[in-house]
UniProtKB/Swiss-Prot annotation:
Name listed for the protein in its UniProt record: Large ribosomal subunit protein uL18
Entry function: This is one of the proteins that bind and probably mediate the attachment of the 5S RNA into the large ribosomal subunit, where it forms part of the central protuberance.
GO annotation, biological process: translation
Molecular function terms, GO-annotated: 5S rRNA binding; structural constituent of ribosome
Keywords: Ribonucleoprotein, Ribosomal protein, RNA-binding, rRNA-binding
Assembly notes: Part of the 50S ribosomal subunit; part of the 5S rRNA/L5/L18/L25 subcomplex. Contacts the 5S and 23S rRNAs.
Disulfide bonds: none
Family membership noted in the UniProt record: Belongs to the universal ribosomal protein uL18 family.
Top-level lineage group: Bacteria
Gene Ontology CC terms, in alphabetical order: cytosolic large ribosomal subunit
Amino acid sequence: MSNKNEALLRRKARVRRALKATANGRPRLSVFRSSKQIYVQVIDDAVGRTLAAASSLDKDLKASLKTGADKAAAEAVGKLVAERAKAAGVTKVVFDRSGYIFHGRVKALADAAREGGLDF
């Protein structure tokens, strides 16, 4: 494994450990970012169940997006996951950036989810 991937895994584990300490039973808004798409899930760790999910591959979004890997796509995914989470009865979450730096696409997704009504 490369040093870059090992560093990402270490950061991811550190972020998850901190989240578990402060979650207080709230679901986790987990982000995965690839080079071509962005994915997000609202996960209830107590039950081990996904409550809501969205990605730039969703049929609702894919036609309207130029690419799945830019800030505009991240904003659209953030708004969509906020709608779906509220429909599932979730408003308070903890943000799991999965070891990614809170900048660019990850920040755009978080800001859009906040605008959509999620509280974190």
